Amino acid sequence: MAAKRSIYCLLLLPLLLSLLIWIPSISLAATNPDDVAAINGLFAALGAPVLPGWIASGGDPCGEAWQGIICNVSDIISITVNAANLQGELGDNLAKFTSIRGIDFSNNRIGGSIPSTLPVTLQHFFLSANQFTGSIPESLGTLSFLNDMSLNDNLLSGELPDVFQNLVGLINLDISSNNISGTLPPSMENLLTLTTLRVQNNQLSGTLDVLQGLPLQDLNIENNLFSGPIPDKLLSIPKFLHEGNPFNATMINSTSTAPSLSPSLSPTKPAPTRPFSGVPPPPNERNRGKVADGPSDSEGSSSENSKGKNSSHTKKIILIAFAGVLVFIILVLAILLLLPKCARRREHANRVFKPHQVGADRGSRENALENGTPVLPPPGRSEKVQREPFKKAGEEPKVLHDLERLRRPAPISRQESQDIDFSMLMPPPPPPPPPPPPPPLDEKVTVMPIISPERPVKKTSPKRLPLTSVKHYSIASLQQYTESFAQENLIGSGMLGSVYRARLPNGKLFAVKKLDKRASEQQQDHEFIELVNNIDMIRHSNIVELVGYCAEHDQRLLVYEYCSNGTLQDGLHSDDEFKKKLSWNTRVSMALGAARALEYLHEVCEPPIIHRNFKSANVLLDDDLSVLVSDCGLAPLISSGSVSQLSGQLLAAYGYGAPEFDSGIYTWQSDVYSFGVVMLELLTGRMSYDRDRSRGEQFLVRWAIPQLHDIDALGKMVDPSLNGQYPAKSLSHFADIISRCVQSEPEFRPLMSEVVQDLLDMIRRERHGSGDSTAD
């Protein structure tokens, strides 16, 4: 009996072990059932499109890696299915997602209305370029975490709901190219982080007063029905487009001396030198011609108007008559002066006339225009003329003056003038056409600088800019290396575009940055090549190296070396196991590497280069955890101002922006501030902005500054994953450097060379001194 039991135990043991191994794997892979139900309903509402992995019932979106799905453990946090020719509708299941943060169905053909209930956890909501109808739902007001929303290029109608009071974190809003009417709701004044607002091509009306207290940097209200004066604060917005509204006509008239106004507009006092103040002029100033206490009956006013019209008509007749008399007198005087000269020339022509010389004057003119092409001066003189700079706008260059001089006939002798005087008897020949502009000269081509305003001007043809070490890749080859930019190769995205992992046939890995069209659309091809050239000149051991580029079929891509350990942001905030590798000494070394990169950009490069987008997501880590800073030299794309729904991602983690950034000011001191924020992340292990924390701890800098010089509080701020393994003195020195970098006044922030020296001194002191504890 005992033998049988032992046999049963031996048989059951492998089965139990298999179950123990299998059950945890099932629990780890299984997607949240609520999310599964939500995505099944979404799939059915879309008409069951062909999307890899997606099914109408059940399934495991996270474990099976459905296309466009990003998960955090078992929760779906993002759905991105862009330009997939989707149809159908969104249905009523979106609100069932428990933790979703991003939804992007842009550039499809989805119709129906936007769901009346939306997931309250949404941060990014993109439905642009579809066929949605109906109005914007009032449930929008429940999205208190919303950062970016784009509903542009749809068929939406109705009025904007007055539900913006809770959307205090909204940074970008685009509802352009719809049929939305009504006025801007009063609750929009609560959008205190809104930097981009696009409402062009709608039927919106009313005034813009509700927007004047917002930190807008990009505002487009073109082709609406807005009226009234534009508030002064809006006129100072760096990118403000407002054509195609009734108040534009008022603005034009207000700066003109024309006596009448458009009948469809309320009369406004002409003020040629006075800008709009945002407040309408007082009633007694609106029509200076009116008498304030004059008769109010219609007869009195009509008689007054008729008198004014009669007097005005009489004045016009007198002016016209006077002008006619004056012109007649001038013509008579001119005829009297010219008659004697014509008579003398007629006598000369009758005495000596040589028919073969009639065209002498014309021939001399044609010498300067052979076959319609201007003849340039001799080579010796041409060199001097070509290098003559334009003195100021509107002034012709010296070469045009020389061409004009060549176009005129050369002086001729008295006898020659007698020979050709017969031409005066005939109508004067029409003047020769003005010479076309000189042919393009390589030395006159000016390519605008793109790294900073002081970069030396390239004097080469924009059609062919030589590249020394940067390889050109075709779009076809990059599609092959990235598997057609597959979702599984997406390793990051930002305001300038998305980054994909590319594997070459030899197995080597690269990172391909596919620039968003809205980030580079204002650059011509030759300007992009110039950008590539300038980035190629940035060479430093702590800066990601550019190895190639692509500019084909309206696509712009940059190919960089690949960093296997991802970004510092991911290492600190997304991977707890990886975070344990980041000892105190490693973090100090990372800060030093990033500081050296910025020191090189600010103080070694000539002219200096401002990064403008420094954050932990742009600090990459290689195999040895050495720091490589990315996106160096791309500031011209950031400042181009053509980034719409992606433009706010620079500020999505709002804590990186220096205080002066709200005023549109960005200098090297702003980079120093952002570097200080990254040092704070290294110190505390916290994100620069964390909405999930309590209100007083959401902004890292605001929370940390009061504690940096408090020894007791400083110890509590340190990242718990360090387990107390850090020298107390080193910690204090590290905090001092941070405090100087994040000063609110730019002039009090240190040079990056000073930061590098301070970090080196801190490391030397630690090596030669005795710390309170030893770092790993």
From Swiss-Prot:
LRR repeats lie at residues 99-120, 121-143, 145-167, 169-191, 193-215, 216-236. It is a multi-pass membrane protein. Residues 269-284, 426-440 have a biased composition (Pro residues). The keyword Protein biosynthesis does not apply. GO terms for cellular component: plasma membrane. It comes from the Eukaryota. Expressed in seedlings, roots, stems, leaves, flowers and siliques. The keyword Transmembrane helix applies. Glycans are attached at residues 72, 179, 248, 253, 310. ATP binds at residues 491-499, 513. Residues 30-35, 338-776 are cytoplasmic. Residues 1-29 form the signal peptide. The protein kinase domain is predicted to be catalytically inactive. This is Protein STRUBBELIG-RECEPTOR FAMILY 3. It comes from Arabidopsis thaliana. The gene is SRF3.
